[in-house]
Amino acid sequence: MRSVLTISVGLLFGLALSSVAHANDHKILGVIAMPRNETNDLALKIPVCRIVKRIQLTADHGDIELSGASVYFKTARSASQSLNVPSSIKEGQTTGWININSDNDNKRCVSKITFSGHTVNSSDMARLKVIGDD
């Protein structure tokens, strides 16, 4: 009887910890294929509007040069914010966290993130992975 109680308590404790860890989970918001020529209209649309406090960017399959990024919020007047992104990301490299939506009292959900940039040093199109943290 005691072992059944110990196992039950252990399972409940494990479930409680996993739900706490899930609350601050980092989610892949999407992946963008970066063309070889400079392009300024690469959009990552977020199908389910979600509050995102910060993002990280990772380069896969090639190096990426970025010339800008903006985040768009779902509001009555389509508010947007320019992001301070690094000018280049090497293959396999992940940036530090880039803060967005910093006004905690006025939480706005993100509807899309746009990028300007292109692939460098690769015959294939590099992929830009966008990771979000709520």
UniProtKB/Swiss-Prot annotation:
The record's keywords, sorted A to Z, are:
Signal
Leader peptide range in chain numbering: 1-23
Q: Which Pfam families match?
A: DUF2541 (PF10807)
Q: Does the keyword Signal apply?
A: yes
| Keyword Signal recorded | yes
Q: Family assignment?
A: Belongs to the UPF0412 family.
NCBIfam families registered for this protein in UniProt: PRK10154.1 (NF007541)
Kindly provide the name given to this protein in its UniProt entry: UPF0412 protein YaaI
Q: Which gene encodes it?
A: yaaI
